[in-house]
């Protein structure tokens, strides 16, 4: 901006000097910190008005960034609450996971899945982690879920035992209800089913209950597949082992 003698301008307008300002050689107020102008003067030198100096503008941008971070965190916690994830796994992050030779390949796959989440969602690509008890498969799927929630995706993290419990409770008016929970599972961007396959254990002792559970399970999985919504599984069983139990 063309810096001009502004004494005559300031005689005609009320523009008190602030504590953090000083007048430069042209009689224009500048910031004591960044030394940039705090006033705009028109090209024809007939108008002047207050404006932000460099550090004021930077402060406003920082406040906007902090507000965006705060808003994003609030939205993340809302999505996390709606995801049905319990308190035990709500802080799981890929960045803080303990990587060992045993799980390195699995975590590399998990990080790649999160990195290309948009492609995974569009192409309906899920994941299947399996291993023995305490192998870390639940933790890694919880990490993936939290990372996707932070990216803004709608996720549901649960296991089928809980789904069935909610449905049964809904019949007595205490749970979410079958329609609500099935809709939630069928319409979220990514569904996470922990301990997949346990619902088939002991089916020979209660065939009617097992049949009902299987119907609900395959109804949900089939609906997600047809609507191209990925599902991430963790299980104690390899796929061929699981197939033998069906």
Q: Positions of the model-derived regions?
A:
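N-terminal pre-Walker A segment at the start of P-loop NTPase domains
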Residues: 94-120
